[in-house]
Amino acid sequence: MGLPWYRVHTVVLNDPGRLLSVHIMHTALVAGWAGSMALYELAVFDPSDPVLDPMWRQGMFVIPFMTRLGITNSWGGWSITGGTVTNPGIWSYEGVAGAHIVFSGLCFLAAIWHWVYWDLEIFCDERTGKPSLDLPKIFGIHLFLSGVACFGFGAFHVTGLYGPGIWVSDPYGLTGKVQPVNPAWGVEGFDPFVPGGIASHHIAAGTLGILAGLFHLSVRPPQRLYKGLRMGNIETVLSSSIAAVFFAAFVVAGTMWYGSATTPIELFGPTRYQWDQGYFQQEIYRRVSAGLAENQSLSEAWSKIPEKLAFYDYIGNNPAKGGLFRAGSMDNGDGIAVGWLGHPIFRDKEGRELFVRRMPTFFETFPVVLVDGDGIVRADVPFRRAESKYSVEQVGVTVEFYGGELNGVSYSDPATVKKYARRAQLGEIFELDRATLKSDGVFRSSPRGWFTFGHASFALLFFFGHIWHGARTLFRDVFAGIDPDLDAQVEFGAFQKLGDPTTKRQAA
């Protein structure tokens, strides 16, 4: 046929049987990738430390999606929350992966069958005997079935009525677990961080989809609307489907990057805005202040800070710190976190407590500046020592650790103080193992960053695809050069341009 690569899909334009076949094959490829990727991730995933080496630090991409839907156990005997399990059941991580691969194989066989047996009676118009699809009816069927699935997910799976529920956590990502969720029917259901909104919105959207599907199955579109929206053209279906997909991709890119109940930080890592706003730092200071108010010592108050909370307050877990084209997991960047060294408190020789100014997200280097409680600069690590007034040596800065592995340890040696001041720019200080994975010390993004970049990019691409195919559908007659209102009988070959009497061919 000699079609260029970008026109090869025209072979299924007027062939409903093979159009169905290629879509089934596409589903086979998607399901096959999902199952294979899950098995690969399970082969390389280390579940031994869910606090300091969680799935998102290891670069897991499909495991978080399985987990948020209620899968927590492995046939390997481990649980995602730590500990061991003796009876994980069929719906373990491996079970879900296997189900996708089996489903992929069945779809592969079905695609081949439909490619071979393409000329089925169901695709033929009874009146003309030619291949034809009743697209408005098919739209109604799909809308009804997707509505049933949507309603079922919200009413049964999420609520735990028939299913495990979903992953639910506290605002600081400390107590996450899979649990049933009650629908939130009040205004709180519109809060993107309220899990109940997931149940209620699926129930509401599913109900609407079922009703809309039944409507489109029982009511035929008016002739003027049918012609105006080109409802008889398969490219209209392509255009509107692309619109639905790019809209969904933009939405999920937003919920992933800005955070929501559907993208828990325990599964996908924290958002960049939590670093920008000092979200975890504020909660840590609130807990320490509460401890001091209960007459605890500084050491006791800091020792009660969960290591998990301290780890979130570290810039290496900020998804915006990794370049988009730096391949590999976060562990391949700054290393595998081994332990929290504790919270460093700096003081000058007059006893004032000093705070290291933290590095903003989009800086690779940042001056080391220590300020007092009023924000006045008291010490720094100068670029030019000859002109320095506030150097650590001149000001006599010391550092003492509270909580963590170095609890109670203090340093007055300027070189050591400066080392920890530099590290305090990056948030809480952790011991990182860079030897095991030969980590290069350059920050990487988390799966939250990859997902957002991928979906935003494809959404933009699909937006242009929607415009392209929509225009081709609506203006097909213009592009073809045929007047749609032409009702005269035209003899093919009589004119150089079809239907244009001014281009009548001259007799040879």
Curated annotation (Swiss-Prot):
Membrane-protein topology: Multi-pass membrane protein
Gene3D superfamilies recorded: Photosystem II CP47 reaction center protein
GO MF assignments: chlorophyll binding; electron transporter, transferring electrons within the cyclic electron transport pathway of photosynthesis activity
InterPro entries: PS_antenna-like, PS_II_antenna-like_sf, PSII_PsbB
Protein name: Photosystem II CP47 reaction center protein
Signal peptide region: none
Function: One of the components of the core complex of photosystem II (PSII). It binds chlorophyll and helps catalyze the primary light-induced photochemical processes of PSII. PSII is a light-driven water:plastoquinone oxidoreductase, using light energy to abstract electrons from H(2)O, generating O(2) and a proton gradient subsequently used for ATP formation.
Cofactor note: Binds multiple chlorophylls. PSII binds additional chlorophylls, carotenoids and specific lipids.
One Pfam family per UniProt: PSII
PANTHER family per the UniProt record, alphabetical: PHOTOSYSTEM II CP43 REACTION CENTER PROTEIN, PHOTOSYSTEM II CP47 REACTION CENTER PROTEIN
Residues spanning the membrane: 21-36, 101-115, 140-156, 203-218, 237-252, 457-472
GO CC, one annotated term: chloroplast thylakoid membrane
SUPFAM superfamilies: Photosystem II antenna protein-like
Disulfides per UniProt: none
Source organism: Nicotiana tabacum
Subcellular location: Plastid, Chloroplast thylakoid membrane
Entry superkingdom: Eukaryota
Cytoplasm in keyword set: no
